[in-house]
């Protein structure tokens, strides 16, 4: 008999995930079907999104090996039935207050930063780069963790040193770039470009650095089809692209600059987004989503 979710105390909630306390050493990390865009959590969920994020994280924790926060299998008996397939039993960690971002291509906030300063997070880059340009080498572009509803703010490596100290800052940078490099090669073998990814780490009671939260999902990473890649234009991606395009297009009637929340998503955008998430999982993992637990 599996426990009820009500039997665990709710510890914290973010845009997409919720944390519950299992015991002194373990947490239940639950991925919801909520979707966020432009710093808003939308009122319309995407069916199966939480399961895809969980399946993708479990897959890549396995590929990467090393020290991660998993403390049970995806069907662990401590996971309640109502969240089976989108929840994981994880170790309780002291989370590092830095979003660890690796970029191999220039897009998003990195492109904005580059266009203003010629650098990203203080890392100088060559002149003449454009949307989706491949960088000479992947770079570490950390961000400070923002409160719910606020923007993560890109920060320099020196700012990370001030936050956590030199030794830990160097390890965060090195581990982030190592993981990005291995995952990028893995995706490339499957015809997919990993443009960038965001990782989070925590410290265990012994002070060891542990890979935590989600890893290499369509929410934390930009995946582009390698077929048709061309620098200088926005690439199609395996994530919330349909949602973003609809919200900023005339059909939604929503003004991004206003204080009003985004409108509900139409059914066709919901289904297209669901299919895109599942396609990302299946193409990258080589597994069938139909076989995932839950």
From Swiss-Prot:
This is Phosphoribosylaminoimidazole-succinocarboxamide synthase. Belongs to the SAICAR synthetase family. The keyword Repeat does not apply. InterPro entries: SAICAR_synt/ADE2_N, SAICAR_synth, SAICAR_synthetase_CS. One of its GO terms (cellular component) is cytoplasm. Its EC number is 6.3.2.6. GO terms for molecular function: ATP binding; phosphoribosylaminoimidazolesuccinocarboxamide synthase activity. Keywords: ATP-binding, Ligase, Nucleotide-binding, Purine biosynthesis. Pathway: Purine metabolism; IMP biosynthesis via de novo pathway; 5-amino-1-(5-phospho-D-ribosyl)imidazole-4-carboxamide from 5-amino-1-(5-phospho-D-ribosyl)imidazole-4-carboxylate: step 1/2. It comes from Rhodococcus jostii (strain RHA1).
